[in-house]
């Protein structure tokens, strides 16, 4: 889990637009963020495998 202070700091707007970065709203992770789903890869995988994200299925070939 990310530190609470870092999550709060990221939510506030920064002085410069370039310094802003995306964080997962569920766990606060700053890396491996998917804009389309607004969450990190770990939370995306967890929710997709449990069937909570509509239209996302596990691929098999």
Curated annotation (Swiss-Prot):
HAMAP family given in the database record: Ribosomal_uS14_2_B
GO molecular function, one term: structural constituent of ribosome
Note on cofactor: Binds 1 zinc ion per subunit.
Keyword Kinase attributed: no
The protein, known as: Small ribosomal subunit protein uS14
SUPFAM superfamilies, per database record: Glucocorticoid receptor-like (DNA-binding domain)
Keywords: Metal-binding, Ribonucleoprotein, Ribosomal protein, RNA-binding, rRNA-binding, Zinc
Binding site for Zn(2+): 24, 27, 40, 43
GO BP term, example: translation
GO cellular component labels: cytoplasm; small ribosomal subunit
Matching Pfam families: Ribosomal_S14
Entry function: Binds 16S rRNA, required for the assembly of 30S particles and may also be responsible for determining the conformation of the 16S rRNA at the A site.
Cofactor dependency: Zn(2+)
The keyword Ribosomal protein belongs to this UniProt entry's keyword annotation: yes
Gene3D superfamilies in the cross-refs: 30s Ribosomal Protein S14, Chain N
Lineage of the species this protein comes from: Bacteria, Pseudomonadati, Thermodesulfobacteriota, Desulfuromonadia, Geobacterales
Name of the gene this protein is made from: rpsZ
Record field: transmembrane: none
NCBIfam families assigned: PRK08061.1 (NF005974)
Family: Belongs to the universal ribosomal protein uS14 family. Zinc-binding uS14 subfamily.
Assembly, per entry: Part of the 30S ribosomal subunit. Contacts proteins S3 and S10.
PROSITE patterns: RIBOSOMAL_S14
């Amino acid at each position: 889990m990310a530190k609470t202070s870092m999550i709060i700091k990221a939510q506030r707007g920064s002085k410069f637009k370039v310094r802003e970065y995306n964080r997962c709203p569920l766990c606060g992770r700053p890396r491996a963020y998917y804009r389309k789903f607004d969450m990190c890869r770990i939370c995306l995988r967890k929710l997709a495998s449990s069937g909570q994200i509509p239209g996302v299925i596990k691929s098999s070939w």
